[in-house]
UniProtKB/Swiss-Prot annotation:
Chain's role: Catalyzes the NAD(H)-dependent interconversion of D-fructose 6-phosphate and D-mannitol 1-phosphate in the mannitol metabolic pathway.
Bilayer-crossing regions: none
InterPro entries documented for this protein: 6-PGluconate_DH-like_C_sf (IPR008927), 6PGD_dom2 (IPR013328), Mannitol_1_phos_5_DH (IPR023028), Mannitol_DH (IPR000669), Mannitol_DH_C (IPR013118), Mannitol_DH_N (IPR013131), NAD(P)-bd_dom_sf (IPR036291)
Pfam families: Mannitol_dh (PF01232), Mannitol_dh_C (PF08125)
Designated name of the protein: Mannitol-1-phosphate 5-dehydrogenase
EC number: 1.1.1.17
Signal peptide (residue range): none
Protein keywords: NAD, Oxidoreductase
Family the entry assigns: Belongs to the mannitol dehydrogenase family.
Gene Ontology, cellular component aspect: cytosol
Highest taxon above the source species: Eukaryota
Residues that bind NAD(+): A10, V11, H12, F13, G14, A15, G16, N17, I18, G19, R20, G21
Length: 398
């Protein structure tokens, strides 16, 4: 059997729009062969049947297309052994599966790392999720005794390095006939923690901004882009707007988004020492981005998974809890959270149905503990209880 020409190899979990359009695109442009891992058999078959797909970047100044090649796809449900071998010989493992799915991909990654030859440099594991510390979370699952025997954790850094990251790119719902092609905005930011690679070079991936202190980037992104996007979507849904763009044409919703981002900007500038003018300009840029008419993003898509988005470290409760502890204004974040609590029984969104059940069958205090992860000692707790009481009262009136 003829030897392949050596190319760098990356395994990416999650062959959805962000995986194909953002992460794999960067890996491809940096000279990696990309191995997609997914449980969607139709998607895996389509990728293996097609030698290429297009990534279409849209912006106010027009569109740009690039072609992605040099990839394969593996069904992680049915071809685990093949996937383990690919991980054991890859330079990089990335994922964009959603924070709730990390625990399901951890066992196979653990097996791949465990099989890795000591002659190879450590594999770089980078989770590309909208969550603070997602790679740390994935690493905890991987190192769990169920997935990695405790005696195999000795010198683990010789086999794997785990780097947290912050990703920022809006990938809207795709056209029904798009196939494998992905449309997304031109703007991107991918910031990764350099500190796990102090004694070695980090992976050579063009477009990554390697930093020594990631938290300011993660919180600035989550509490500006995701807070702003979701605020527009939830207020828009309640006011029967169809897209985020439509919502932001409404002056009242525009004002709600502006006020929510004033709340979070206060936290970001005070906590991380970010210049107020720089944060103001960042906010202006973000509002322009989420107002992009070329990204026809339905409010139902942006608002989906309200239970996750109302959780303790997420875009509303996370910043509001810190602001409340310091006696600072978080009223616009509470208003946005109220709209998220009203996002119930939305077609195609399981979490919105689950939220409706929780709201219908629990006392307000228990809802806040269960959904938001807050305890009674926190200053935000009674404020969110009031929000839940209001929503429940309206539901009883209907």
């Amino acid at each position: 059997m003829a030897a392949n020409n050596y190319t760098k190899k990356a395994v990416h979990f999650g062959a959805g729009n962000i995986g194909r359009g953002f992460v794999a695109c960067f890996l491809h442009n940096s000279g990696y062969e990309v191995i997609f891992a997914d449980v969607n058999a139709d998607l895996i078959n389509a990728l293996n049947a097609s030698p290429s797909y297009k990534v279409i970047e849209v912006g106010s100044e027009g569109t740009e297309e690039s072609t992605i090649t040099n990839y394969r796809a593996i069904n992680s449900r049915t071809n685990e052994e093949e996937l383990i071998q690919e991980i054991a010989t890859a330079e990089v493992v990335t994922c964009s599966v959603g924070p709730n799915i990390l625990k399901f991909i951890a066992p196979v990654i653990a097996k791949g790392i465990d099989r890795r030859s000591e002659d190879l440099p450590p594999v770089a594991v980078i989770a590309c999720e909208n969550a603070i510390g997602a790679t740390d979370t994935l690493a905890e699952y991987i190192k769990d005794p169920k997935n990695t025997p405790s005696h195999r954790l000795e010198n683990y850094e010789k086999r794997a390095r785990f780097a947290n990251s912050a990703i920022d790119r809006i990938v809207p719902a795709q056209d029904a006939d798009a196939g494998l092609d992905v449309k997304l905005e031109k703007f991107y930011e991918w910031v990764v923690d350099r500190t796990p690679f102090k004694d070695m070079s980090p992976p050579d991936i063009k477009g990554i901004n390697w930093v020594d202190n990631l938290l300011p980037y993660i919180e600035r992104k989550l509490y500006t882009v995701n807070t702003g996007h979701a605020t527009a979507a939830y207020h828009g849904y309640i006011r029967r707007k169809s897209t985020v763009y439509d919502a932001l044409q409404d002056k009242d919703i525009q004002e709600e988004v502006k006020k929510a981002l004033e709340n979070t900007s206060h936290l970001i500038t005070q906590k991380h020492g970010i210049d107020e003018q720089a944060q103001h300009e960042y906010v202006e840029k973000i509002v322009r981005r989420i107002s992009n008419p070329h990204l026809e993003d339905a409010v139902e898509r942006v608002g989906r998974a309200p239970l996750r988005k109302l959780s303790r470290k997420e875009r509303f409760i996370g910043p509001a809890a810190e602001l409340a502890e310091h006696g600072k204004d978080c009223s616009a974040l509470l208003d946005a959270a109220e709209m998220a609590f009203r996002f119930q029984n939305v077609e195609g969104d399981e979490e919105s149905a689950e939220l409706a059940k929780i709201m219908a069958s629990n006392k307000p205090e228990d809802v806040v503990k269960q959904v938001c992860g807050l305890n009674e000692q926190e200053k935000l707790f009674p404020k969110v209880v009031e929000v839940v009481q209001r929503v429940q009262a309206d539901l009883h009136d209907d």
